[in-house]
Structure formats: structure tokens, C-alpha cells
């Protein structure tokens, strides 16, 4: 029986490996070769259809239940298994939701486009959402409470109650616990909405692996631009602030995402200046306190300065060293033979023997802990400070008394200093498995959080000796935190060498020239295409991409005068370039799709210089209707909104008017009917989640 069971188990393992071998590898999928386009890529509107038809399968629910959504699924394997383990629990499911905006019962506008500068784009007909869920595709019945897989039918198999599948699917689009959630409009503009690595609930996919996958996906589908709102968290802290001062940029910059414009009208130059300013603050600003008692901040900084092999001078040096210690997993012992030493072996042994004598003297009648600071002070005249620091760093684990005793060390969380004492070898057998010369990872994370709250975060920053330095640090940190939007431009230099490749710009004859034009669309035509073929292909492209262009017709090519439609296009424009066309489209019933910002004629003119929605909380003036940042008018984000608000311009105009009685003027606290803050109305209207927390790990 044992042999038979073992044999069956082996067969099942081989079968599992054979099935998973047919799946694409998550770490390499998708690639240009997989898509069959090793040199050129079609426009996104065409490439996404080919991608889904080639790699995905239509999943439940079918489009007959609700015509606005179509769901697809692609199964991937995270890597090859070499130990025969069951890979079914380690498969990655990529769900693709194709949303027809014109048939959707939800908001047709994209709030994410509005806050990154794409608010003037026409509403796209379709959105493609790429989701890797952290949980399974199960739904709980509202009547009996039992859960079942969605592929098992639209009725509960326990009580036969009809399940609201459409509502469940839409709720998934608003969930911020997904490991990955990205949306790509049919014009090729994309948003990364959600990314959660191991700290965000991922079992085996790291944040970096997920980000690599998203970047490859965008590249292979010929995405034009992709945005991300960097609100990522690491170790419970704002990672854009930590990564900004240690690397000089956002974590997403490693994949080509660049800062374009920030909230509160911040520019790229202001962002870089803030990063440079905060990174270069010298640690000496916090160490010299005159006759004041030694603080916890002073102890922590001195502690890590003594641990580092290189000199820690600035804020950047300090935080970079702590993050490096966490990454390198300080509990793992380092090989002392690989450490380059500037001193001879006899010099090191001489200093360490002196320290051993001090430990022996302090250990009578019982072994007492001696701090690193006390040891350094006791032998400061016998060797250079650099040699003493080196010997202390490698002091833990030194054998004495013919190997019967050993130097034991620990990190005291109360004093943030190392302590040493002599112990019997039998009591410290664990030293062979861990490096006691370094603080534990959890201890370093605890110190990192303390330093972050004391030195970096503007709301919790401590008082320093120099008030000017503190104000400068608060200003720089606030600017870094205000810069959340980053964009990557996927510039494609590859063109089809056996076709005509044109960027087609459109101008509507029934609109003013000042009206915003849609982004140009890329057209790929055969070499023998005529002007007539160009008009047909251009009309088809814009009709497929934008809802307002449903009845779009091309009238003429601009810049070429009156030309015959039968002229070969290659002789007119060549095989590459930009062409402008003029057309007309009946907008009857389609005006709501004119721009992603919606049909409301709202205006932003804040004193900080902001002229458009940037995703921050705003308030409209009850006098002129112009929107202003609540923070810029003195209202903190945590404070309640006033029932009535007048901007500075209206107050100035009001003060110049003849005075009225109190009864006519009315109270400034009278509520305005239907009053809603812009930040809140945008969130309610779009159903989107702009403040999603991204956790990388």
C-alpha cells in the first residue's frame, strides 16, 4: 500500500508539472515574440484584440447577462517547480475585463485622466482592466451566506437565489486589495491603479515582479502613456518620501516613470530641489545640542554611525544605510575572511584583548553588560577611533579563556546601543546561526520608523536646534509628498517597414479651433493605399476609439488642397510622418462623451497657481464658483468644511460694495443646499479610488 500510494503521488505531481508547463511564465510573459510581432507592434486598439484572442479565454459571466462587460482570463505560472510540489496553489490568474463605456450603468468619465492632465481627451469607447486578485473568484449568497465559484452558475447552488453578478464584477473594479489593477483606454493611455506586493497581501509575488509584469504588458500592447499615483507604503511609511531622499526619485522611476507636474502647481524643478535639499541636510544639525541631555535621536544616529563602515554625514546617508541593513537581512552572518581590513591582525587582537580585560573586570562577581560607549571611552587612548570601531564591530563571538567563554553581544532597545559580556560557550551556541554584531531587522525597522517620524514627515517632525533648518525640511518634505503623479511615455521607435505608418491628427469642422483636439491615432496602411483608403481607415480608427466619434466622417486632408481620392498615398506623404485631416461627426446624443472631465463647466484658479483638477481636495467659492484647494485657503484636510465660502477676490469685491444690513447680508454660516467639496464629488461621481494604497515588497 505504501508503494502504491507513493507511486500515485508521484504520478499526480508529474501531471501537475505537465499541465503548468503549458502555461506562460509570469516572469517573462508577455514578450514581443509571444505576440508574434518581434519587430513591429500594431496600435493598441488592434493589438489588444489580437492579444486576447491568442492568449485569453472568455470566462463567466457571458456578455449576454449584461452587455457592458466581457471578462477574460489568462493563467500563468510564477516559475518552474523542481521539488515536485503541487503548482495548482501557485498559479497566477490574470483577469481582463473589457468594459463598453457607452453601455455602462456607472460613470462614463475617468477621474484618473482628469488629475494627470488628460481631462480634455474625448471619452474612450472601451476600457480594458487587467487584474490579479489577491483572493478567489467566489461570491457569497446574500440569502444563505454560502459561497460558490462564479463559474458554477448565476444561481446559488444551495438556495437557487439569483446572484447579482454584474454588481460583483463592478465591485471588483473598485477594490484596492488586488495585487495588480491597471486600466488601459482604447486610445492606448493607461493608469496603474493598484499594486500590492508581499506587504500588501501577496503570498509569493513581490511588488517588483508585479511591476515588471505590468511594464512588459504595456510595452507588448503598444500602450502610449501610463500614469501612476504613487501613494505606496513600505514598512508603514510613505515610500515616495523614503525612496525620494535615498535614490533621488520615485520607486516607479526604475521603470521609466517620470514626474511631470505635481499637486499645488509644483514643477519638476521644484520637486528635484526639494529632494536635493532634504537629502543633503547634515546629521550634525541634530547631534550638537549644547549642554542639553542626550536624546533618543542622538543615540540612534550615533549608534548607526558606529555600525557603518563608511561615514554617515547626511540624512540621505543615514536612511540609505538603514534600508540597506533591512535588505541585506542583518541576521545572516557575513564572512569575516572577505572583509578588507586596514589594520594588521596583531593590532586588532591587541585592542580586543584590552576590551576582554575590561569585560572580565566588570564581570565580578557576576557577568554584567558593558555598553559599546563605555568600552570606547575606556580604551580611547590606546588606539585610533577607526580601529576601535572596527574591533567593536567584530567583537561579538570572540573566544577567550581557551575557548571556554565567548564574547556575547546584544542590542539594547532602550539605549539603542550595543552591549557586551562574557558567557559560557554552552549558553551562546546560537551564535553560530546569527550575527550578534548587528541589530535585528525588526529593531532596524523600528528605528527607521522613529527617524522617519522625527526627521522626515512634516506633521510629526521634531523640534531642532535650528528653527530655519526645521522649516526648510518641512517645506521640502511637504513638496515631495505632494508630488504623487508619475507618467511613462512608451515611445515606440519601431515601424512596419513594408507599410505606411502615419500619425493622424483630426480637426472637427463644426467646432472652434480653440476646442481641444483628441490625441492623434496611429494608422498602418499598405504601400499601395490611396487617399480614399486613408480616409476610410482614419474614420474607422476614431470611430472605434472614441464614443463621440461614432458617426465621424472624414471630409478632407489638410495642407494638400483639393486632391483626388485615387492618388496613391505614398507619393503624397511618404511612408512615415504626420497627417492632418478635417471631418465632421453628428453629436446628437453624444455630447456627454466630449471630454473625460465631464460636461460641467467648472473652473480652477487657486492662489498656488493650479488651473486644473489635480486630485487634491477643493472647495468652490459660493460667489464666483471658482474652485480652490482647501489647504491653500487655510483648511486642513482633516478639518470640516465651512457651510459657506467666499474666495479672496469675492471678499475684495464685496468690501467695495455699499454696506448692507446684517439681515440683508445674511450669516456666513448659512448652509448652502447641495454643497459638496470637489474632492468628494469627484470620488462619488466616478466610483474610482484615487487614494488607493500601493504596497511594494
Curated annotation (Swiss-Prot):
* Annotated disulfide bonds: none
**Subcellular localization, per the record?**
Nucleus
Instruction: Report the Pfam families cross-referenced here.
Output: PHD
Kindly report the protein's main subcellular placement as a broad class: nucleus
Q: Name one GO cellular component term.
A: nucleus
One Gene Ontology molecular-function label: zinc ion binding
- Keywords for the protein's UniProt record, in alphabetical order: Metal-binding, Nucleus, Transcription, Transcription regulation, Zinc, Zinc-finger
Protein name (database record) = PHD finger protein At1g33420
UniProt organism field: Arabidopsis thaliana
Amino acid at each position: 500500500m505504501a508503494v502504491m500510494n507513493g507511486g500515485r503521488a508521484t504520478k499526480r505531481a508529474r501531471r501537475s508539472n505537465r499541465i503548468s508547463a503549458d502555461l506562460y511564465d509570469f516572469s517573462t510573459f508577455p514578450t514581443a515574440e509571444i505576440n508574434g510581432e518581434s519587430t513591429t507592434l500594431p496600435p493598441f486598439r488592434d493589438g489588444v484584440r489580437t492579444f486576447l484572442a491568442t492568449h485569453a479565454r472568455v470566462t463567466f459571466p457571458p456578455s449576454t447577462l449584461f452587455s457592458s462587460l466581457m471578462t477574460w482570463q489568462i493563467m500563468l505560472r510564477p516559475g518552474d517547480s523542481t521539488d515536485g510540489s503541487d503548482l495548482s496553489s501557485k498559479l497566477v490568474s490574470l483577469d481582463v475585463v473589457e468594459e463598453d463605456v457607452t453601455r455602462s450603468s456607472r460613470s462614463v468619465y475617468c477621474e484618473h485622466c482628469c488629475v494627470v492632465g488628460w481631462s480634455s481627451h474625448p471619452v474612450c469607447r472601451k476600457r480594458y482592466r487587467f487584474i490579479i486578485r489577491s483572493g478567489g473568484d467566489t461570491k457569497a449568497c446574500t440569502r444563505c451566506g454560502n459561497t460558490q465559484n462564479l463559474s458554477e452558475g448565476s444561481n446559488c447552488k444551495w438556495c437557487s437565489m439569483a446572484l447579482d453578478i454584474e454588481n460583483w464584477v463592478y465591485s471588483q473594479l473598485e477594490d484596492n486589495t488586488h495585487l495588480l489593477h491597471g486600466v488601459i483606454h482604447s486610445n492606448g493611455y493607461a493608469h496603474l491603479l493598484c499594486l500590492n506586493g508581499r506587504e500588501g497581501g501577496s503570498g509569493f509575488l513581490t511588488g517588483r515582479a508585479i511591476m515588471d509584469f505590468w511594464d512588459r504588458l504595456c510595452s507588448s500592447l503598444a500602450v502610449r502613456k501610463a500614469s501612476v499615483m504613487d501613494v505606496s507604503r513600505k514598512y508603514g511609511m510613505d515610500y515616495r518620501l523614503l525612496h525620494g531622499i535615498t535614490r533621488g526619485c520615485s520607486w516607479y522611476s526604475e521603470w521609466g516613470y517620470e514626474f511631470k507636474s505635481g499637486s499645488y502647481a509644483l514643477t519638476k524643478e521644484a520637486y528635484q530641489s526639494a529632494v536635493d535639499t532634504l537629502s543633503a541636510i547634515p546629521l550634525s544639525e541634530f547631534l550638537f545640542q549644547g549642554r542639553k541631555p542626550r536624546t533618543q535621536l542622538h543615540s540612534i544616529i550615533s549608534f548607526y554611525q558606529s555600525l557603518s563602515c563608511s561615514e554617515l554625514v547626511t540624512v540621505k546617508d543615514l536612511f540609505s544605510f538603514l534600508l540597506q541593513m533591512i535588505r541585506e537581512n542583518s541576521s545572516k552572518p557575513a564572512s569575516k575572511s572577505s572583509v578588507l581590513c586596514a589594520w594588521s591582525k596583531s593590532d586588532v587582537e591587541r585592542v580586543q584583548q584590552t576590551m576582554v580585560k575590561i569585560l572580565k573586570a566588570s564581570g565580578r562577581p557576576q557577568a554584567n553588560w558593558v555598553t559599546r560607549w563605555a568600552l570606547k571611552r575606556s580604551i580611547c587612548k590606546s588606539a585610533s577611533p577607526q580601529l576601535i570601531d572596527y574591533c567593536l564591530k567584530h567583537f561579538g563571538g570572540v573566544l577567550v579563556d581557551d575557548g571556554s567563554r565567548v564574547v556575547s553581544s546584544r542590542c539594547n532597545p532602550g539605549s539603542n546601543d550595543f552591549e557586551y559580556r562574557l558567557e559560557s560557550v554552552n549558553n551562546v551556541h546560537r551564535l553560530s546561526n546569527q550575527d550578534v554584531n548587528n541589530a535585528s531587522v525588526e529593531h532596524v525597522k523600528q528605528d527607521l520608523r522613529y527617524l522617519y517620524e522625527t526627521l522626515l514627515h512634516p506633521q510629526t517632525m521634531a523640534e531642532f536646534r535650528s528653527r530655519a533648518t526645521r522649516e526648510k525640511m518641512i517645506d521640502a518634505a511637504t513638496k515631495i509628498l505632494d508630488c504623487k503623479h508619475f507618467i511613462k511615455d512608451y515611445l515606440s521607435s519601431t515601424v512596419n517597414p513594408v507599410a505606411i505608418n502615419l500619425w493622424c491628427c483630426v480637426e472637427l469642422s463644426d467646432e472652434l479651433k480653440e476646442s481641444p483636439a483628441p490625441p492623434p491615432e496611429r494608422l498602418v496602411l499598405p504601400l499601395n493605399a490611396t487617399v480614399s483608403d486613408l480616409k476610410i481607415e482614419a474614420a474607422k480608427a476614431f470611430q472605434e476609439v472614441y464614443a463621440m466619434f461614432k458617426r465621424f466622417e472624414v471630409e478632407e486632408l489638410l495642407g494638400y488642397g483639393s486632391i483626388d481620392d485615387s492618388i496613391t498615398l505614398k507619393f503624397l506623404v511618404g511612408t512615415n510622418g504626420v497627417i492632418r485631416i478635417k471631418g465632421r461627426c453628428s453629436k446628437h446624443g453624444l455630447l456627454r462623451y466630449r471630454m473625460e472631465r465631464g460636461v460641467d463647466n467648472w473652473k480652477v484658479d487657486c492662489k498656488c497657481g493650479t488651473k486644473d483638477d489635480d486630485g487634491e481636495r477643493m472647495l468652490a467659492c459660493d460667489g464666483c464658483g471658482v474652485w480652490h484647494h482647501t489647504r491653500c485657503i487655510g483648511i486642513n484636510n482633516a478639518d470640516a468644511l465651512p457651510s459657506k465660502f467666499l474666495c479672496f477676490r469675492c471678499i475684495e469685491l464685496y468690501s467695495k460694495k455699499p454696506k448692507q444690513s446684517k439681515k440683508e447680508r445674511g450669516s456666513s454660516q448659512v448652509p448652502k443646499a447641495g454643497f459638496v467639496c470637489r474632492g468628494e464629488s469627484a470620488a462619488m461621481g466616478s466610483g474610482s479610488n484615487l487614494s488607493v494604497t500601493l504596497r511594494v515588497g
